[in-house]
From Swiss-Prot:
Assigned protein family: Belongs to the chaperonin (HSP60) family.
GO molecular function, one term: ATP-dependent protein folding chaperone
Protein name as catalogued: RuBisCO large subunit-binding protein subunit alpha, chloroplastic
Subunit composition and interactions: Oligomer of probably six alpha and six beta subunits.
PROSITE patterns: CHAPERONINS_CPN60 (PS00296)
Alphabetically ordered keywords of this record: ATP-binding, Chaperone, Chloroplast, Nucleotide-binding, Phosphoprotein, Plastid, Transit peptide
InterPro entries in alphabetical order: Chaperonin_Cpn60_CS, Cpn60/GroEL, Cpn60/GroEL/TCP-1, GroEL-like_apical_dom_sf, GROEL-like_equatorial_sf, TCP-1-like_intermed_sf
Transit peptide: 1-6
Length: 546
């Protein structure tokens, strides 16, 4: 009988298990917390190749593995907070890590003093839910490019150039657009906006090329045939070819494949100048291919000739073809610029994709859906990041990625004062929330959240060389918009000064910190692999060495 034996485990209970978790959490949160605020420090990560200098919370969290297995379990929980916040909001990972550490620290003290962990967790959850409702009421919608620039600048570590670049890019591609970040071959950081819909398939044969110098097919006002069928017999498409030739319109065929007699005939007639045609393979695979072909059909006003709906290519009429104002095709990509035949249909399609995007849990599906929305909305901007060294390039790309995510989060749920001020102001609402809680331990949970909320603002001040408690005290007794600007060392209206955080980032940081803290507080034991004893090293040989 085949059997697998599990590794020997080490089990720790009660206070010793909680102390080990706390030690691991503290180590990771200390390393991540160094980067918080405009005067936060960098962390050097010794990775394969040259060391990496980073200022990004989630990157640091993911790089840390502690030698002690029990402490590493605690560190893994903070990694989880950072990753979850990064996935849902794209920024605020350091704030989430600091909040989680504080809630866990004060919570474990209460548990050790005899509080009921389940009631504590319930109190924390109720308090956080009430704070999120308050946050949603207080958030202000983004007004124009100046707000977008301020959000991006703060998130990129006060890099105004990045802020301006992202504001310009979003202005061009719109809120439904996609910003992609690539490495540049030069020292310059530039923005390029790609108009129209791009699909990652090029011409089937280079014989279709109309611009031999650039090896491109370039058409204007082309008719577009879209099908998921394979075209092998020329007789299937002769009626369409005759009609488009009479109209003197170029024809773009997007099909599963064009092969054999059909391809040979198209190429020969193209070279003779009889036909102005190009064939491209359909992008994607399976269900995604069908969805992308439907997107192209809606954009160009074509009727998608789907085999499973009984729409055969040989029966296609000229009215079922779409129109593309401009078509540019290289050996591996096709760009279509079209004026959507039906704006209502296009908007309905975009709304449907947005609904799918909000419901999916898959990161891969989210990226693909966002890409499809952007292509339909007609906006893809590429930020090409340049730097003098590989180390600087990596750091810059991470900052720009944070800025991009923060900007879209701000457009989605609005903005609040930055610099940790929002969390300090929210802490003043907690006494009113506590009054609605009847259980003593639940009220203790509310107190724990209140103490934790001031930690990010205190740490931002501390990283700037100022006494954190003094700063928190001043913010607490100020108006909602007033906070501490660590960059200029002044107390001012942060919304006017451009020190802004997206409300979504603050919300996700608070929710994820409370979620993981609740799990830690209700933990009573840790089970980890027992470290294997090291094999004794061989003694050096005795006697004369030659």
């Amino acid at each position: 009988r085949f059997s697998v034996r599990a590794n020997v485990k080490e089990i720790s209970f009660d206070q010793s298990s909680r102390a080990a978790l706390q030690a691991g959490i503290d180590k990771l949160a200390d390393a991540v917390g160094l980067t918080l605020g405009p005067r936060g420090r960098n962390v050097v990560l010794d990775e394969f190749g040259s060391p990496k200098v980073v200022n990004d919370g989630v990157t640091i969290a993911r790089a840390i593995e502690l030698p002690d297995a029990m402490e590493n379990a605690g560190a893994a929980l903070i990694r989880e907070v950072a990753s979850k916040t990064n996935d849902s909001a794209g920024d605020g990972t350091t704030t989430a890590s600091v909040l989680a550490r504080e809630i866990i620290k004060h919570g474990l003290l209460s548990v050790t003093s005899g509080a009921n962990p389940v009631s504590l967790k319930r109190g924390i959850d109720k308090t956080v839910q009430a704070l999120i409702e308050e946050l949603e009421k207080r958030a202000r919608p983004v007004k124009g490019g100046s707000d977008i620039k301020a959000v991006a600048t703060i998130s990129a570590g006060n890099d105004e150039l990045v802020g301006t670049m992202i504001a310009d890019a979003i202005d061009k591609v719109g809120p439904d657009g996609v910003l992609s970040i690539e490495s540049s071959s030069s020292f310059e950081t530039t923005v390029e906006v790609e108009e129209g819909m791009e699909i990652d398939r090029g011409y089937i044969s280079p014989q279709f090329v109309t611009n031999p110098e650039k090896l491109l097919v370039e058409f204007e006002n082309a008719r577009v045939l879209i099908t998921d069928q394979k075209i092998t017999a020329i007789k299937d498409i002769i009626p369409i070819l005759e009609k488009t030739t009479q109209l003197r319109a170029p024809l773009l065929i997007i099909a599963e494949d064009v092969t054999g007699e059909a391809l040979a005939t198209l190429v020969v007639n193209k070279l003779r100048g009889v036909l102005n045609v190009v064939a491209v393979k359909a992008p994607g695979f399976g269900e995604r291919r069908k969805a992308m072909l439907q997107d192209i059909a809606i954009l160009t006003g074509a009727e998608y000739q789907a085999l499973d709906m009984g729409l055969l290519v040989e029966n296609t009429t000229i009215d079922q073809l779409g129109i593309a104002r401009k078509v540019t095709i290289s050996k591996d990509s096709t760009t279509l610029i079209a004026d959507a035949a039906s704006k209502d249909e296009l908007q309905a399609r975009i709304s449907q994709l947005k609904k799918e995007l909000s419901e999916t849990d898959s990161v891969y599906d989210s990226e693909k859906l966002a890409e499809r929305i952007a292509k339909l909305a007609g906006g893809v901007a590429v930020i090409k990041v340049g730097a003098a060294t590989e180390t600087e390039l990596e750091d810059r790309k991470l900052r720009i990625e944070d800025a991009k995510n923060a900007t879209f989060a701000a457009i989605e749920e609005g903005i609040v004062p930055g610099g940790g001020a929002t969390l300090v102001h929210l802490s003043t609402v907690i006494p009113a929330i506590k009054e609605k809680l009847e259980d003593a331990d639940e009220r203790l949970g509310a107190d724990i959240v209140q103490k934790a909320l001031v930690a990010p603002a205190a740490l931002i001040a501390q990283n700037a060389g100022i006494e954190g408690e003094v700063v928190v005290e001043k913010i607490m007794f100020s108006e909602w918009e007033i906070g501490y600007n660590a960059m200029t060392d002044t107390y001012e209206n942060l919304l006017e000064a451009g020190v802004i955080d997206p409300a979504k980032v603050t919300r996700c940081a608070l929710q994820n910190a409370a979620s993981v803290a609740g799990m830690v507080l209700t933990t009573q034991a840790i089970v980890v692999d027992k470290p294997k004893p090291k094999a004794p090293t061989a003694a050096p040989p005795q006697g004369l060495m030659v």
